[in-house]
């Protein structure tokens, strides 16, 4: 999945879209649209649409929910931010920078998983993270790969300034780039990581399992829309955890359908799931979302985004956007809360109250 903010283009495009398309206020309604893009942890969205599970839960609450696959990840978030969708699959980092940073109050309705090895820093030859000093590193700039690199460098007392530059490289070109003599190190995500590590001399220096719980994959929804239409949240969460139950039980038909939709086979999809910490039960998701570690993670993410100039247009500090947590606490500006981690609906699922 292209988990990235393409420089400041996404933010500028979003600002224009908001000015033209954002609704004045959320209203009670019966038809909803949700966008998603291909990634191991989000394949259930395609399955619950194709299988009729989403329709079943929507009908239970007397509403209609359309689940739409968007091939461009950043574009899906931009369209959500501009009001074309009521919800979208996104990482915590990209939610903070694009919709929340752009002034669209957004709620993490479902905390689905975190990357636990899917993203990695890879060196050509032997060595450790400290050996990146003085070397160029190829990655998708301003993406979770960039964030992973920053966290890795920090762990050994280095920063990006100690490198011989970061070279913005498309994920589509990453495998070919690693094979060239000029490229010494890359940061990318699966399935590219698995392919590159098959190359002779490729050494994994650091991966997302070294920062567990920091690259989080979510289903986020417009806060005002959710507040005006709680049945929308109930239907989405109910459908999601029905599919989680199928996955947890090893339902091969469901898993094979997800694998094929993501362009791999069952074995390949299971390999990707192995480096993804899926929260198959709502209770697990609630526990993670209520943890003391989440606010610290979001502060780290906000500082990274501010340092790169993408925490909202004209953000004066890393505290520009407020983030609220289930216990009522906040990080960032408590007077500008635009991102909310809310366990209400996941707790309903855990309690069997949907």
What are the functions of these language-model segments?
Residues 13-14, 24:
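Cleavable N-terminal signal peptides
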Residues 228-314:
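Secondary-structure end/capping motifs
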Residues 55, 78, 82, 96, ...:
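Solvent-exposed, polar/charged alpha-helical surfaces in well-ordered, non-transmembrane soluble domains
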Residues 20-26:
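Sec/Tat signal peptide C-region and signal peptidase I cleavage site
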Residues 27-169, 184-190, 213, 353-354:
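Short, glycine-/small- and polar/acidic-enriched structural segments
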Residues 94, 166, 172-267:
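Pocket-lining segment of extracytoplasmic ligand-binding domains
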Residues 302-354:
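Conserved C-terminal helix/tail region of periplasmic/extracytoplasmic solute-binding proteins
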Residues 1-12:
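Bacterial N-terminal signal peptides that target proteins for export
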